[in-house]
């Protein structure tokens, strides 16, 4: 049986890309009402199918800086006592919803590379003891092997140039039989190689 071909990652400077993404989402965290080329906040969450009962109990600081592209919970609610990793947690809206679903006997780790987003997420968590927010990258998750029952992510995988590396990390932190629930965006046509190198297309 022939092994599957691993796609080649685009030739883009990862550090430059990360800096550009951080700059963009620092602005979303600090100035959520400024207006961006993408939708944000509660209106976006409602468009994406987030239930009012999930949103009503969340801090406004987490909701106002929400910038997801999908709804990972549309793939299924999480179970009590499950362990969850939220990759690219942003201001924490998905992590906090997950924390409510898994209950105090479960655990949620939210990971993001943007410090201002993490500050909002931590503030939003308040005294919840089963939610933790860590600085990190999706390709280098600060999570032990086989820790999670579920990995969730929302609008982040599209920003990672090496998708194979990203999904390999997800597989590493998942328990056997664990699951992935992702909301994201896809292109429906091939992207020329030279276009993949343009930082402004990744962040725009």
Question: What is each PLM-predicted segment?
Answer:
Residues 2-48:
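N-terminal auxiliary segments of SAM/dcSAM-dependent transferases
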Residues 38-83, 94-101:
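Conserved alpha-helix/loop element of class I SAM-dependent methyltransferases that forms part
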Residues 69-72, 79-141:
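Class I SAM-dependent methyltransferase SAM/SAH-binding core
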Residues 84, 151-152:
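Hydrophobic beta-strand segment of the Class I
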Residues 101, 158-159:
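A short His-aromatic
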Residues 140-145, 161:
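Short conserved loop adjoining the S-adenosyl-L-methionine
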Residues 164-179:
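A short glycine-rich, Lys/Arg-flanked "PGG" loop and its adjoining helix->strand segment in the class I
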Residues 185-204:
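Short, glycine-/aromatic-enriched active-site segment of Class I SAM-dependent methyltransferases
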């Amino acid at each position: 049986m022939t092994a599957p071909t691993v796609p080649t990652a685009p030739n883009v400077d990862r550090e430059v890309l990360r800096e550009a993404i951080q700059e963009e989402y620092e602005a979303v965290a600090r100035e959520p009402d400024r207006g961006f080329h993408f939708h944000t906040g509660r209106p976006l969450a409602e468009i994406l199918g987030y239930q009012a009962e999930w949103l009503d109990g969340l801090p406004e600081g987490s909701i106002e800086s929400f910038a997801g592209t999908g709804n990972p919970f549309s793939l299924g609610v999480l179970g009590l006592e499950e362990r969850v990793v939220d990759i690219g947690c942003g201001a924490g809206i998905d992590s906090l919803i997950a924390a409510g679903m898994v209950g105090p006997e479960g655990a949620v780790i939210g990971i993001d590379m943007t410090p201002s987003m993490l500050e909002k997420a931590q503030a939003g968590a308040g005294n919840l003891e089963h939610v933790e927010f860590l600085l990190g990258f999706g390709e280098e998750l600060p999570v032990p092997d086989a820790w999670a029952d579920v990995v969730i992510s929302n609008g982040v995988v599209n920003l990672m140039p090496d998708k194979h590396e990203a999904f390999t990390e997800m597989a590493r932190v998942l328990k056997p039989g664990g699951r992935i629930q992702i909301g994201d965006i896809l292109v429906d046509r091939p992207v020329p190689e030279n276009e993949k190198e343009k930082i402004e297309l990744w962040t725009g």
